[in-house]
Swiss-Prot record:
Phenotype seen when the gene is deleted: Mutant accumulates cyclohexanol.
Binding site for NAD(+): 42, 95, 161, 165, 194, 196
Organism: Acinetobacter sp. (strain SE19)
Enzyme class: oxidoreductase
Protein name per Swiss-Prot or TrEMBL: Cyclohexanol dehydrogenase
Function: Catalyzes the oxidation of cyclohexanol to cyclohexanone. Required for the conversion of cyclohexanol to adipic acid.
Catalytic activity: cyclohexanol + NAD(+) = cyclohexanone + NADH + H(+)
Length: 251
């Protein structure tokens, strides 16, 4: 990460979940570089603090927060932490998630289904439920939800994940309509297979074949799209689904 070079976001405050690694981390670093005060939230506080230390060492503003996004009270506390630490909340990137069990629908356990829905869908609702009032109180802002290409198409053997991400897509659209005239823009980002810990267990060569571009995506490439959607450059963009997938879904 380069030293802080701009104040493009005019001293805005952002809450990012799942920010201890992968796309969330890359987005936290990029936003900090552009002058955003970032709450780096993750279920792994040590990982979150490492990201904060990196940001602060380079002249940015950040604070670590431990939160299990599947627990409503944790998200309430995360939003309160953002406001108490930096004075307001203007931006949110609801990014935390898990892949869950890889099994056919009949073999997917009930517990596995509930967990993947809770972490990937319910958690986004819990997050927005508490973020929206804070953002309204700050005079408006923007939210981006991570929904994956699995929120647009079917993928076998991860039915719970696919269902959850389709739910995030729908939730994003509904909320965008509710707050379009109230000063909050809400969009979703839909990455293909990105080189993050989420897909570390899979064979990379096989995943590369799924993308006509001939490679996997990098977290920084998704972060650039998220930063755009959170910025005033996207002032007329709300209720949209931004696909970052190397043409995966164009086949």
């Amino acid at each position: 990460m380069e030293k802080i070079m701009s104040n493009k976001f005019n001293n805005k405050v952002a809450l990012i979940t799942g920010a201890g690694s992968g796309i969330g981390k890359s987005t936290a670093l990029l936003l900090a570089q552009q002058g955003v005060s970032v709450v780096v939230s993750d279920i792994n506080l040590e990982a979150a603090q490492k990201v904060v230390d990196e940001i602060v060492a380079l002249g940015g503003k950040a604070a670590a927060n431990k939160a299990n996004t599947a627990e409503p009270e944790d998200m309430k506390a995360a939003v309160e932490f953002a406001v108490s630490t930096f004075g307001a909340l203007h931006l949110a990137f609801n990014n935390a998630g898990i892949l869950g069990e890889v099994n056919s629908t009949e073999e997917l356990s009930i517990e596995g289904w509930r967990r993947v829905i809770d972490v990937n869908l319910n958690a986004v609702f819990y997050s927005m439920h508490y973020e929206v009032p804070a953002i309204l109180a700050a005079g408006g802002g923007a939210i981006v939800n991570t929904a994956s290409i699995a929120g647009l198409i079917g993928i076998q053997n991860i039915s719970g994940y696919v269902a959850a991400k389709h739910g995030v897509t729908g939730l994003t659209k509904a909320a965008a309509l509710e707050y379009a005239d109230k000063g909050i823009r809400i969009n979703s980002v839909h990455p293909g297979y990105i080189k993050t810990p989420l897909i570390a267990e899979f064979e990379e060569a096989e995943m590369v074949k799924l993308h006509p571009i001939g490679r996997l995506g990098q977290p920084e490439e998704v972060a650039q799209v998220v930063a755009f959607l959170l910025s005033d450059d996207a002032s007329f963009v709300t209720g949209s689904q931004y696909v970052v997938d190397g043409a995966y879904t164009s086949k």
